[in-house]
Amino acid sequence: MSVAYLIKPKEKKYWELLCKPHLDGYIYPLKFTGKKMTIAQAKDQYENELHDLLVHDSIKYIICCDAEFYKALVAKAKPSVEIGTIKTTKDGAFKITYCPSPLSSFYNPDDFKHKFELVYTAVQKHIAGTYLDPGQGIITTGIYPKTLLEIKEALNSLHKHRKLTCDIETFSLKFYEAGLGSIAFAWNEHEGIAFKIDKSPTEQNTEVRKLLKEFIETYKGKLIFHNIAYDATVLIYQLWMKSLHDTKGQLDGLDYMLSNFEDTMIITYLATNSASGNELGLKAQSFEFAGNYAQENINDITKIPEDDLLKYNLTDVLSTWFVYNKHVGTMLKDNQGRVYGFFKKILSNIIQMQLNGIPIDMKQAKKVAKQLEQDEQDALKRIHSNKYVAEFTSKLRYKAMNKYNLTHKKQKTLLDFDNTFNPNSPLQKAELLYEDLKLPVVDTTDTHQPATGNETLQKLISRTNDQDIKNLLQAFIDYVDVVKINTTFMPNFLSCPYDEELKWHFLFGSLHLGGTVSGRLSSSSPNLQQLPSTGSKYANAIKSFIKAPPGWIYCGLDYASLEDHVSALLTKDPNKLAVYTDGYDGHCLRAYSYFKDKMPDITAQLDEIEKEGKIFKVTHDDGSVEFLNENNPKLKEILNESNKHT
């Protein structure tokens, strides 16, 4: 069979073991000069070495197991959603498809097996002349109502279906700017409807919105979403809420949207989660069904023709059905039903948190922003005024001058060059610190280069006695700290929307359930979990403008040592339970358990207590707790008093 496998040399034996028995062919190990091949390197290797060799060997099909190499050979390649899709190389010489590395079978064998089956089935079908691109022909019934009457009739016809998948397309990812571009419903993997709603981001179609709201309020079946935390947040705000903090509208919307729903993203998470992680996106989970149907301009739906947008929206809901059918059985088989039910309850809290947002005192935020900008400029000034940076800047200019003069007849002088040190460049920082200043390399990056992050710089401060170097390192640390806040967080704070009703600004973000292997919440736009916290130089500055509007109270709740409570209840360990039943300090108890030899005074005191007799825990009427020795007169007095009343 004229099939070529392009793989990394170290993967050859695994490919021969796992894959070659299913689909015979020839292995062509790729040449790697580093940890990862660049597209330019891949292109050069293909054009100067592989192409002629493949032609000579009469190869017709390529199975490429390296994403960068695949991108070099295929136009507009998206490897993760083109597994098992037969493409043509840019030069038209070969048919090609992408397959993940066989090494992935060691940490996620079922996933690799599934994807490899897609690959070899696609190649076999293409050779036999029966291949169809994924996604071709999946829409057997696509209804696209245009007029108000057609939309009303289409929505009425949906009431007969017990389950519907649903998806919306919006003008923005921010719910308060999103509008409602279009919506789609499907009753199986091949049949559904999709229709336009708002004409533009600023022009609402109130009549269609009214019909949609009435349908959701009266539909008795189950609505299935992929990531309902986004769709429901947008729909609740756009259909039920009259302002950013219309509490009645918010609660009404929550009741209707979450009365009977499923979320295929959570189902996928529970069915596929492993230590190696997983891809939860709808496109990634349905690529073998729908293919790569992503629209290039989906971030701005105004650039997509209406017919294309509606077909795209419909494909989303058909794919949601596919993902539901693909994973719901696995989730239930793995006894994850109760966990799923718990996650569904949590989604209600997440959606409400996303709609409520964080109150921001804009006047104070602007004041803090001004101070942060000043801190950034101060740090830059300290960096550029440092004598070692001045010397390095001169070196940069000399290098630029020499490079120019080597290739030009008309020579330039040093005054013609204004190169300056760039503190945002890891390469320049590494050259300055490790080559010029000869500091020791205490940490390296993933690519084995000397690290220049703040944790590394903090270590380096103690590795030199030169005060100018210490000052420079501290200036770097201060600069990075403040720049991160100024570029990542402050733009979000300063641009957050104003609520006319409460006369206050609010910051809104997205929370993701199932976005981590551990199950912890994750956050984006902005990442609220990375806000400067206790211990950070700017924690108090940020907290100073997170403030409730006049007449309101902003409060926070947190579990007290939640993990320790759970551990004590699950293990029934007497010492762990004693922390809560007898009022011990958990940290002290653990410290003594681990390091008894370091605490002879405590050991001696415990020995003396044991000699004196048993210890009793006494809880007084006011709730206070006291531990008394059996020979303590106070204990005897308490016992005598207690006996009088029994």
Regions found by a protein language model. Name each.
Residues 1-133:
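A polyanion-binding, active-site-adjacent surface
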Residues 22-23, 180-184, 630-646:
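Short, intrinsically disordered, charge-balanced linker/junction segments flanking boundaries
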Residues 60-67, 165, 220-231, 554-556:
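Acidic beta-strand-to-loop metal/phosphate-binding motif
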Residues 74-86, 90-106, 112, 186-190, ...:
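Metal-dependent phosphoesterase core characteristic of DEDDh/y 3'-5' exonuclease domains
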Residues 128-199, 247-254, 277, 288-289, ...:
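Conserved "right-hand" nucleotidyltransferase catalytic core of DNA-directed polymerases
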Residues 188-223:
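Nucleic-acid-processing active sites and adjacent nucleic-acid-binding tracks
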Residues 225, 272-275, 557, 579-582:
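Conserved, non-catalytic sequence blocks in retroelement Pol enzymes and Pol-derived host proteins
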Residues 586-641:
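Generic long, charged, amphipathic alpha-helical segments
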